[in-house]
Amino acid sequence: MKVAAIQTVMGLSPEETVPAAEAAMEAAMQAAEKPDFLILPEYFSYYGLDQKSAVALAQPLAETPAYRMAQAFAKRHKVSVQAGTILAKVEGEARVENVTVVFGREGEVLAEYRKIHLFDIDDLGNGPFRESDYIKPGNDIVTWEFDGVTFGTAICFDGRFPELFRALRLKGAQIITLPAAYTMITGEAHWELFARARAVETQCHLIACGLGGSVVVDGETKSSYGHSVIVDAWGTVLKRAGHGPETLTATLDMAQVEKLRKGIPVIRQRRLVGETVTPAN
């Protein structure tokens, strides 16, 4: 499975960020070995001046520029695209949803996942933050099939909850994706650590696509960590990005996943935790 993580940077307008993301995706498709699957970061289309402005600009999911671009791109290039995350307006709700949507080679929707664990924290150096003030959490654990491979996904803060990743493995996931927008403080300390740990404990390849770059708002600089990584099921970092815009590509060996699971059959050997999801196999 040939994959590409399209690391884009923070922006304050979809009119700026969506075309930039599309240009990076177009460049990735010019490679001699074209990817089968592309992923963008969390908040790739709009980071927002603040929470209120992000909510004010939200539209119904299928009407957003980010959704329309990703769907058209998938159909045009016959490639699967995971459109990072999009803030989507929900009828009758004051809060929006943080949704990642996956398109197949014909632009059909393969999956939609709504972020379950929201980033509500006390002051770690940049002041407190409560994502739940403006985002409605999801509830569903989501997997999908593409080219004979089972994918699962989580979003950013979800990465701190290994039980979600175990549930994805039990639902049959072989590749797990993680669009994210980590802070500089948490990113430097935990981002790659979590990516490798989640890959090892699930015996899945993991594509962690992080938003990078910085914006200045009212004289204050806001930054997102970036440093996307593609990690194999053994926990080896195959590719690693920096802080700016960058595209990572890798060919994921699906036979390695099955070999590891047969060699270290952790799902069969579990004793301390009851089933939350019935194993797929």
What function would you assign to each model-found segment?
Residues 7-9, 39-41, 114, 210:
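Residue-level recognition of beta-strand->loop/alpha-helix junctions
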Residues 8-12, 51-58, 149-151, 178-183:
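Short, basic, glycine/proline-bearing loop/turn elements
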Residues 23-106, 110-112, 182-201:
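Cys-nucleophile CN-hydrolase/nitrilase-fold catalytic domain and related Cys-dependent amidase chemistry
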Residues 257-281:
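A conserved C-terminal secondary-structure "cap"
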Residues 7-24:
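N-terminal phosphate-binding loop and adjacent alpha-helix
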Residues 91-171, 184-193, 197, 259-266:
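Active-site catalytic loop in hydrolytic enzyme cores
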Residues 1-4:
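Extreme N-terminal starter segment of soluble prokaryotic enzymes
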Residues 61-82, 150, 159-248:
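CN hydrolase (nitrilase-like) catalytic-core segments centered on the catalytic cysteine
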